[in-house]
């Protein structure tokens, strides 16, 4: 029986471990071929297809570090014969990859199933007929006995209609019946009142009169009690007005405080006099522009100076047209 032994690179560094693994998985009568799994996965070594009855993978690492690429699992599947086994230090969490490659996952190994033989299913040949021969129409048999009427939409007899109307009148569904005449019975409201219910004793208060015919005066206490009701209502209104006055008063105080603060801010603001707000006259001594050099000449004047083009002058000196007559000529 041909056996392929795939060794992890760490096994090669320890010859004693390699020999112990061979004794564990391989018997004396088996033909063994060993390769490093990296060389097999990278196609450096040529391995025959469908040749080995068993492939043993030896990996001394822990179980969670024994993973194999899905492509390598497919290669191992191709090395095995039908019903061949892949055993050894198998990865613990790649059963799905093994199934996708074609293996049948079992407890201690992965099995390559034997391919199922194809079964030929004979097809029934149609009888050849002459194309010119006309096709026969299907034949239907007529029933010997007519079936009974099962249509419930047949018209009812007069007795059935009478029975149905009587049932509708006896039940509450008579209100929804379409056979009603559409006339509503009017009820007289006066008949609902019984005359016996009207003969109840009415309590009539006695007149405030004395036996001698004089009217009894109301006592001071009653007058006070009657007045308390009015006083209570007025007190309630007064409380509401007082509450409203308090709210309005607090709002007025807040408005006054804000007005005082605004006045304080306005008092601190910078105010200009009329002399300061008037247009600057550069012909008057002490009045200067932003550059303070309007009287020196164009070389010292700013871009917006109104005296651009005029000769230099002294502050306070009157400028006449005769002085610049030569420049305009």
From Swiss-Prot:
Annotated residues for binding of [4Fe-4S] cluster: 291, 294, 302, 305
Short sequence motif named Cx2C motif 1, residue ranges: 291-294
Region described as Disordered: 141-162
GO cellular component, one term: mitochondrial intermembrane space
Keywords: 4Fe-4S, Cytoplasm, Iron, Iron-sulfur, Metal-binding, Mitochondrion
Subunit structure: Monomer. Interacts with TAH18. Interacts with MIA40.
Protein name: Fe-S cluster assembly protein DRE2
